[in-house]
């Protein structure tokens, strides 16, 4: 996972911890917790099943030189990622997916708006963070076990 994505997910995890303490009865139905659940489903199941699926294509929205970028759409959120299906490592062919960025509630999808996730992400790409090179994305990525973080919340704040 790219640090840009990790930062957004960590913020959501912190909010989930607060909700677990302050609103335990509403925890499962809280919009932030539902958003976190959707992200978990996307990165652990839906996207890895077939990252090349046409539903993840974004066309020329970011410009023709950024067509390799994929995105998952859910509500007014966009999760941007890149994948490569033929990376060789130790004579084994690997499929690598790098989850790069997710907009927050300050930049919900609204076509034409300067804070629209596509507009924000395009500016980020032009500024070089995240990098356009897949190799650089992989180098910048960090190991982040989201499931471990969720288990920590459950242990810290049992029902």
Q: What are the roles of these predicted feature ranges?
A:
Residues 1-76, 84-159:
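Basic, Lys/Arg-enriched alpha-helical interface segments
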């Amino acid at each position: 996972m790219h640090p840009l994505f990790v930062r957004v997910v960590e913020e959501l995890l912190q909010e989930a911890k607060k909700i677990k303490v302050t609103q335990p009865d509403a925890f499962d139905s809280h919009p932030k917790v539902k958003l976190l659940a959707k992200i978990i489903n996307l990165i652990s199941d839906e996207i890895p099943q077939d990252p090349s699926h046409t539903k993840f294509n974004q066309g020329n929205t970011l410009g023709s030189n950024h067509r390799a970028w994929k995105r998952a759409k859910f509500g007014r959120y966009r999760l941007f990622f890149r994948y490569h299906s033929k990376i060789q490592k130790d004579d084994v062919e690997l499929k690598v997916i790098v989850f790069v960025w997710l907009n927050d509630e300050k930049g919900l999808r609204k076509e034409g708006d300067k804070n629209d996730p596509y507009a924000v992400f395009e500016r980020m790409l032009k500024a070089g963070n995240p990098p356009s090179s897949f190799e650089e994305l992989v180098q910048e990525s960090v190991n982040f076990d989201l499931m471990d973080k969720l288990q920590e919340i459950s242990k810290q704040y049992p029902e």
